[in-house]
Amino acid sequence: MPFIDDALLWCPDNDGRLVGGLDLGTCIADDSTANGTENLNPSIQSAGNPNNPQQSVGGEILGSVESAGNELNGAAARNVNVVVEPLCGGDSSDELFRSFSESNFEIESLLSDLATVEVKVENEENNNNVITDDDFASVAAAVVANDDLLAKENAQLSAQGLVDSVAASLADSGDAGGQQALLAFGSSSSAASAIAAAAAALCGDLINNNNNNSNSNNNSNGNGNHGGGGGGASSGGGVAGDCATKLEYALMGGQPLAEEPRFVTSAAANPLLVEKLMSKCLNIEKRMDKLSDTEIPIVKQSTSPAPQQQLQQQHHLQQQQQQQPHNGSTFAGATALLHIKTEQNTLLTPLQLQQQQQQQQGLHGAAGNGGSSNGNNAHQQQQPLAIPQRPLLHNLLSGGAIHNPHHRNYTTATTGSFPPSPADSGVSDVDSSSSGGQPCADELKARLGMPPATSASAAAAAAAAAAAAAHLHTGTFLHPNLYQNNAANSLRNIWNRSVGVPDNYYGSSGAGSGGTQPGGPGNPQTPGYLTTSYFNAPTAATAAASQRGTTINGYHSLHQQQQQQQQSQQSQQQQQLAHQQLSHQQQQALHQQLSHQQQQQQQQQQQHPHSQLNGPHPHSHPHSHPHSHPHAGQHTHSTIAAAAAAAAASVVSSSSSAVAAAAMLSASAAAAATAAAAAGGSQSVIQPATSSVSYDLSYMLELGGFQQRKAKKPRKPKLEMGVKRRSREGSTTYLWEFLLKLLQDREYCPRFIKWTNREKGVFKLVDSKAVSRLWGMHKNKPDMNYETMGRALRYYYQRGILAKVDGQRLVYQFVDVPKDIIEIDCNGV
């Protein structure tokens, strides 16, 4: 097991090989303690071995690593000098650049390949890693040692790791856990880590990027980074940890160390290489930003993240953009590059959640971001790790809701499998389909977008559309643009952190339709995954916008939020504020999608419910229910017409807020445009305009119409029942039996068939067409004719059942006359 000594890093599995033509042992021999310097360079072969003990990072190394991280301001500087001085010092800088600029070290070709070929590594052993330790370490060490036997894909991975190390050092140079950035990519080889750290230090000092952000956890490997804000705990990567520690110490503390001028002189001696590195890094960053919109990697055993986690990610991105210094504009997109390429498994155990929360709190505390740091720390206690996520293929199949600003979200919102709720309130979510009082058939029709059969009037049809819209978000045909409001939620989060309001204050995070009041007395915090999820946002916003124009026109939205958290009447106005988040463009687009007939009905219905807005509501429910009711406190049964009251009463009174919310789709959209013009003075300053809702609404209306237009089942053609078919009452299957029964029935004999010689069993088909038609009816073959029946009669010739009487047409004879034949006098006809 490798351990960190006070003076240098010692590893037992090394053999003193040269790294890229640079003998680290001879450079470090100048230090006072040269014990074990030949062991600084681990073998390249051991890097790709999954059973290497260096790669199995256990809990026993965490104490020594954390203690080394705590010595950052003290004796750790001496450890830094041991490694960084030979890598970046004045004596060996030419040697290092010579090793970089050799012809066989084709970094330009590697970077160009990386810019054109997208590298995706599927994790095999550890689900918490994006790029596994084995892959990256073996490839990076092989590139340094000029190993030509490795494949081109591995070379691309090594360039990926080199560029990511550079970007990581720039992105994470402002916090105490910054040394985890270079260790985040899991290099098991100290040689590969040293080269990556040297390249990162060169790029970082040349650009003089001194930005501070608090995002190193998004770049952490997850395999060994369990020390809360301490030193890097990656396996065998202590050399890179020391280099990163030195670099972070110089950048974070702002104190120039002795080796910083040597970086600059080394760069001045080799300007061409530095220029290549800079241009390629920038090209890769631009290319990755383009590729991020179309790439859907497959990560094993991953679920959709919490919406709060994605909001936290957007908050991190905005913090980075705000804290970029002016001289760091060259690498302004480096942190975004790491955001895009980072994924983590969100199936976290409670122990991992606790560790990551402690780690994030330590990082936010050490970042020193002023007043926002306290809000971040308070917010971390409510949410798990903020992880940038791309829409994974697994999420497309499993149906988790994704709100990512980089992608359109082609996922469906199912209420069956949610990730663990970040609120940790112990209140379980309730499926909206199971909370209503409607019959099962109506629920199924509502899920399919079909109106119930009982909707006779236009108002009843509106209630049916409400139920359909309430349950449509559980289906699989939702339009990709339905899940919006990401930028609005990120701005909302910034305001929340300044006033200390948690994210689930707004209810469901993507819709802006939640009405819970976490600060109220006796009200448990509702989970962020509400049943009134995604389609209710346009409905809720238009309804509240129309009410805003009539009731709270003089209020300012921020002023409302700060004063209305203690009384039940004020909680209703908080619900209105959550509904005000939609812009006028969306309201007008929603208004254009509704028919003129619905608009006339809605204008009549809009006049009564608003007068009761600030008074007691007969159907408003307290907010201590397991799920919130953003609309139940605002709309009475008079909102829906009297004909639909019976259909909607059971739903509203049973606290299914999704149905009540969707009912306002037809009840409030007509007055939305006029109310928007009237409420211009109280326009919310939080929500910006997002993409159009008209496209989404037309999609949903087309979906509902398509579900209604089902083809009718074709009816079976009725058979002509010219005669009664008594022959079907028995179990007759053969034609000769059928003819024998006809001969014994007075209805058919002698009308269609008759005996010519009863003793000999000779009979004649009087009406061959009628007999064949009767036989076809018996066999359920309406196209039966005499030719077809005649072939069956000829078949009986060979069987010895019937015989053809010569010289007479349509005359046949039974070979063996049955004795139990009913005697019918047919000779008189």
UniProtKB/Swiss-Prot annotation:
- Which intervals of the chain are annotated as region Disordered? 214-237, 301-329, 353-383, 396-443, 508-533, 558-641
Does the entry feature the keyword Transcription, yes or no? yes
DNA-binding region located at which positions? 733-815
Q: Where is the composition biased (Basic residues)?
A: 618-634
Q: Where is the composition biased (Gly residues)?
A: 224-237, 509-522
Q: Where is the signal peptide?
A: none
An example GO CC term for this entry is: nucleus
A Pfam family this protein belongs to? Ets
Q: Where is the composition biased (Low complexity)?
A: 214-223, 308-324, 353-364, 374-383, 423-437, 558-617
Cell location: Nucleus
Key words of the record:
Developmental protein, DNA-binding, Nucleus, Transcription, Transcription regulation
Which biological processes are named by the entry's GO terms? Answer: autophagic cell death; autophagy; cell differentiation; oogenesis; positive regulation of transcription by RNA polymerase II; regulation of development, heterochronic; regulation of transcription by RNA polymerase II
Recorded GO molecular functions are:
DNA-binding transcription activator activity, RNA polymerase II-specific; DNA-binding transcription factor activity, RNA polymerase II-specific; sequence-specific DNA binding
Upregulation details from the record are: The expression of this protein is developmentally regulated and is correlated with the 20-OH-ecdysone induced activity of puff 74EF.
Matching entries from InterPro entries are given as: Ets_dom (IPR000418), ETS_fam (IPR046328), WH-like_DNA-bd_sf (IPR036388), WH_DNA-bd_sf (IPR036390)
Task: Please report the name of this protein according to its UniProt entry.
Answer: Ecdysone-induced protein 74EF isoform A
- Organism encoding this protein: Drosophila melanogaster
